[in-house]
């Protein structure tokens, strides 16, 4: 019986992979990933067993990984962040449902951007928080507005993914809704290109959100009413 590992690789930095992930990637027969992840790992692992394709060819990548596992191979398919958070884990599990007696599947967690970004900012998620995607592909506009209204009133800390995908239109909507219920001085943090050479960290306020500074690699953290900035560079939500 073949085995399929569905692995989250965080931001693609080798040094932030879990030891479990490194051991699996050294042992499997094949590794499927997108071209960006391929570029990150082809020097750390045997590139002859890595099969990379275009980022937007997710469906084909999943199908090929499943087919290889059905042929009896031990296979890994990689996704950024954690594959169970806006990732490929659900795609794989839905597609192999009828083959569960022929493939052994393991979901291997990765460090999602909410966690790695929070660590760079300080400790913005000490209390309850929500994670919301602003992706045009995943976010139904009407449902998104309803979610944002509820979250704005709740005073939860919020992490926004895909804030510029493909435009900042949904980000503008989100900010305007939050400003209806929260102080314009609410602390926000933006992390871009986490643990990469062009990494950028920004601290600001909800009213002064720098739209011109965000891109497809940015994650937005919105604090609650207790969130503050220490020493002009650390974002903290007090525990007590």
Feature roles, as predicted:
Residues 1-14, 19-105:
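Class I S-adenosyl-L-methionine
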Residues 4, 153-240:
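A contiguous loop/helix-start segment that scaffolds small-molecule binding in enzyme catalytic cores
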Residues 9-11, 33-36, 53-55, 80-82, ...:
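Fold-independent oxyanion-binding glycine-rich loops
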Residues 9-16, 138-141, 202-204:
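Short gly/ser/thr-rich secondary-structure transition/capping motifs
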Residues 19, 85, 89-157:
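Class I SAM-dependent methyltransferase SAM-binding "motif I" and its flanking Rossmann-like core
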Residues 38-40, 58-59, 112-115, 137-139, ...:
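Short gly/pro/ser/thr-enriched loop/turn and capping motifs at secondary-structure boundaries
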Residues 73-79, 124-134, 154, 206-216:
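A polyampholytic, Gly/Pro-enriched intrinsically disordered region
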């Amino acid at each position: 019986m073949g085995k399929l590992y569905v692995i989250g690789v965080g931001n693609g930095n080798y040094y932030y992979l879990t030891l479990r992930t490194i051991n699996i990637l050294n042992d499997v027969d094949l590794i499927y990933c997108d071209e960006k992840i391929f570029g990150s790992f082809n020097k750390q692992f045997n590139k002859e067993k890595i099969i990379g394709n275009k980022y937007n060819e997710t469906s084909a990548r999943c199908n090929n990984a499943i087919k290889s596992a059905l042929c009896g191979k031990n296979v890994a398919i990689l996704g950024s962040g954690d594959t169970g958070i806006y990732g490929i884990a659900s795609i794989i599990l839905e597609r192999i449902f009828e083959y569960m007696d022929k493939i052994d599947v393991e979901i291997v967690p990765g460090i999602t951007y909410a966690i790695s970004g929070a660590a760079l900012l300080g400790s913005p998620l000490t209390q309850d928080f929500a994670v919301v995607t602003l992706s045009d592909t995943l976010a139904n506009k009407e449902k998104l507005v309803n979610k944002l209204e509820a979250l704005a009133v709740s005073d939860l800390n919020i992490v926004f993914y895909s804030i510029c995908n493909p435009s900042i239109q949904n980000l503008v909507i989100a900010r305007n809704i939050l400003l209806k219920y929260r102080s314009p001085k609410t602390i926000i943090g933006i992390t871009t290109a986490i643990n990469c050479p062009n990494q950028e960290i920004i601290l600001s306020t909800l009213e002064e959100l720098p739209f011109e500074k965000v891109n497809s690699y940015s994650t937005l953290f919105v604090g609650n009413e207790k969130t503050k900035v220490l020493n002009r560079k650390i974002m903290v939500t007090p525990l007590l």
